[in-house]
């Protein structure tokens, strides 16, 4: 019996460790080439948990197997620190001064109309109320169409202290809105393959220095409300039929792969824009609709890796915890991100979970010029 237990611990530890390493580096794989294998990164949290459990079990029962999960964690450390950074000093209050630049990226979900607001003219609007209470310099808002009502609400509560506002409209219904304390010099629509999503750049004059804000709302998964509810039921163990679980899993995975292929092309277009402006202060932010262990994230974050100065993931650099920006229907993930070029240094970053007005939580980061 002891031999069976010992062998089982060895096999499970080995498989968990291999799975952790594979899922850690799945973001290098283009879904247009590697198809299903490129989605392995979505299983990273599961293999991380399994490896941690194996580490504890080996430490308590079979110390001679301890090296297996230990070395797996070492090999996967870059992905582990990306998924769960541990900068606990960042949990304190941010330092504010005239030399800092504080930016929020927030998918407002059409000013939360999709979150059960029956009256689009509901007052007060919870998204606008949340924004009005913030002390930030720049607001990068996705899914934020400026209707007469939303414009009036912003004018009444927000633009009194952040007086510059502009928008970029995509081929579909999606809108990027930027509200700034600093003058908006110009803007540029980023043209790429999309089904109703959008990216755009805004040039700001920040205390005499020109800074580019590249705001993004990348390809959505395209789940219907019914599919989201089916997935939630499956995650919470409410689906008992094997066929139901199989059908739901197949539908969800198929849509993730389809959207990932589109986002891969979008990410490559954004990486080209980033390289074209590598000598300018640049902030890249928005709703990427993808996780840190994805090709989308890897392509954008590594756009300048061949250069002397790479992009910095602000959350990874100074924050703590997994920082989930989406938590609905059994899905918990960090899919909203913010990067800065080497001209800027992040000093504080957090995901604000005090508001549930939208289906996303905003990410707020503070930087200083180097």
Located regions from the model:
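Metal-dependent phosphoester-hydrolase catalytic domains
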Residues: 6-20, 25-57, 67-68, 188-190, ...
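Acidic/histidine-rich helix-loop elements
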Residues: 105-124, 222-259
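Structured beta-strand-rich core segments of catalytic domains in phosphoester-bond hydrolases
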Residues: 73-98, 125-132, 138-234
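Active-site environment of divalent metal-dependent phosphoester hydrolases
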Residues: 110-113, 146-149, 171-175, 196, ...
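Short, Lys/Arg-rich, polar N-terminal cytosolic tail immediately upstream
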Residues: 1-4
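Active-site beta-strand/loop signature of hydrolases that rely on acidic residues for catalysis
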Residues: 102-108, 123-151, 167, 212-217, ...
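Membrane-interfacial entry segments at the cytosolic side of transmembrane helices
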Residues: 61-72
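Short, glycine/charged-enriched secondary-structure capping and boundary segments
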Residues: 118-121, 153-156, 228-229, 297-301
């Amino acid at each position: 019996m002891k031999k069976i237990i010992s062998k089982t611990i060895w096999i499970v530890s080995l498989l968990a460790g291999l799975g952790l390493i594979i899922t850690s580096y799945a973001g290098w794989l283009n879904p247009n080439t590697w198809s299903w294998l490129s989605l392995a990164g979505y299983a990273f949290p599961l293999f991380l948990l399994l490896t941690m459990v194996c580490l504890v079990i080996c430490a308590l029962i079979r110390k001679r197997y301890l090296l297996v999960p230990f070395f797996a964690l070492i090999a996967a450390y870059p992905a582990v620190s990306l998924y769960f950074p541990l900068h606990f000093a960042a949990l304190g209050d941010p330092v504010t001064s005239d030399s800092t630049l504080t930016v929020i990226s927030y998918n407002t979900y059409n000013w939360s109309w999709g979150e059960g607001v029956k009256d689009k003219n509901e007052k007060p609007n919870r998204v606008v109320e949340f924004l009005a209470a913030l002390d930030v310099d720049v607001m990068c808002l996705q899914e934020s169409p400026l209707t007469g009502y939303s414009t009036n609400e912003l004018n009444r509560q927000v633009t009194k202290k952040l007086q510059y506002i502009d928008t970029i409209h995509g081929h579909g219904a999606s809108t990027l809105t930027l509200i700034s304390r600093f003058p908006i010099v110009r803007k540029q629509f980023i043209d790429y393959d999309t089904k109703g999503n959008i990216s755009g750049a805004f040039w700001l004059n920040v205390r005499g220095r020109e800074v580019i804000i590249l705001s993004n709302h990348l390809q959505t998964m395209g789940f219907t409300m019914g599919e989201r509810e089916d997935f939630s039921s499956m995650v919470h163990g409410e689906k008992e039929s094997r066929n139901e679980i199989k059908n739901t899993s197949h539908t969800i995975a198929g849509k993730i792969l389809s959207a990932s292929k589109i986002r891969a092309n979008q990410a490559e277009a954004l990486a080209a824009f980033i390289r074209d402006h590598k000598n300018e202060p640049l902030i890249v932010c928005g709703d990427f609709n993808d996780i840190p262990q994805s090709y989308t994230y890897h392509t954008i974050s590594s756009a300048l890796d061949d250069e002397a100065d790479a992009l910095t993931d602000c959350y990874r650099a100074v924050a703590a915890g997994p920082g989930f920006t989406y938590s609905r229907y059994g899905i918990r993930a960090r899919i909203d991100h913010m990067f800065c070029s080497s001209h800027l240094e992040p000093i504080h970053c957090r995901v604000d979970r005090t508001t549930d007005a939208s289906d996303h939580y905003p990410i707020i980061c503070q930087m200083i010029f180097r």
